[in-house]
């Protein structure tokens, strides 16, 4: 046997196997997605997302307190308005009495050490279920005013106390619009801008759309989310968002797009890189484990470690509560 053929001596021991990883999973890498509804007492199971719930603001202390004591560092909030009147411009998105702003304010008071990100989009709040304004009398997105409206919502969340605003709408120009408003308001140095830069038009969003009530009333979102086979377009979107002032770059979904995540690491070596293990990915892992195909913990680790290997420094994951326990084991 050639000397260069011998590899196993370098990973025969569990500790030596850990050393083979450039980076290992830590609790601080995980950001937990939380669905916030406008019923302050809500605690409602989400059938399509096993183990996840819609929460009212008055339930957050009892829910998140134990997780924070286990080491939870960050959450990202998604509004689920059930009682508001939706309109063409998504007016409830930045309602001071809406679920996201109330949750930001409450969490800042309850848990000063918790990092709070807020997803910024209009689809949960518009009467048509799309992520921006429509040209009058048409079903075509009006990009420029959509980007400005998204920026207004982001600014409202920043003013409420969000540490991070994360626009997921995929409107052209929204990163620059948000950054400009944060600068003009004197908040650009106090609020992180995390861009869903490479967000693909994926079939893996179904459980989330049920959870958030964000299914479009007509058509789909393929005109503004990226085509799944468009690697070059994703690279251009990442470059654009860096130039427009994004502080963190995100790839979504995660597992089918690890090549894009690796591209992002090459394009933006100085930026933190996030990926979102989306609802469909989570549901598949849970379903496979329930069917006896594999053990849940094993597959949760394998998928998450593949994301870190590809370059992720931050993982948005519904498995976050489990990892708080698993990483202590």
Tell where the protein language model's regions lie, with residue ranges.
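N-terminal amphipathic/basic leader segments beginning at the initiator methionine
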Residues: 1-21
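Alpha/beta enzyme core
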Residues: 13, 21-22, 26-31, 37-329
